[in-house]
Amino acid sequence: MAQELKVKSFSVAINDLSASVETVPDKNGDPCALVKILLVDSIVKVEGFVLKTKSVSPTEKWVYLSSGAKEVRIMPTHYKPISIYFPNFGVKGVEGKRTYILDLEADHPLVLNQ
């Protein structure tokens, strides 16, 4: 049975300049926002206004979204997919050249059959 994830936190990383240093343009040439997803599982797919993804470590994936994006859907390997609507966490829409941290956690620890 697949376990569910929940958002531990989602916020702007004011001192993190990654989105301005590693700028990714959207289809109109405008700079994207960067959402750093923290999760103790691999992520199979991310849906939304995603322009680029980058696996930084086994527990961190960078996702570049078009400025103004309000949500993202994440499909991890061992958990049910989760949709995150940013306005529920005080962010009306992500802004270009800004970095956000999305920290996800499970209700229960992941137990794999051996």
Spans of features found by a protein language model:
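Short loop/turn and low-complexity linker motifs enriched in small/turn-promoting residues
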Residues: 3-114
